[in-house]
Amino acid sequence: MNQLYNGMPAALMGGIVWRKSHFSNPSGNCVELAELPDGRVAMRNSRDPEGPALIYTRGEADAFVRGVKSGEFDDLIT
């Protein structure tokens, strides 16, 4: 596997299993996440599956998910 870096094309991340929320839009407009072999977490837009992926440490991903769960971003979608 190539060295994984922030912003790299997701298409070059061979062998990565992408997951999305069960609450996601069935038409494919979703945020997808994947665990990388080194434990980091990659994020991509399902509308552009070969496009750039953002890569976060586990701590960064954990802080984001906790913020989502606690409603910190609700004002952006309501």
Task: Please place each PLM-identified region on the residue numbering.
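Positively charged, low-complexity terminal tracts
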Residues: 1-78
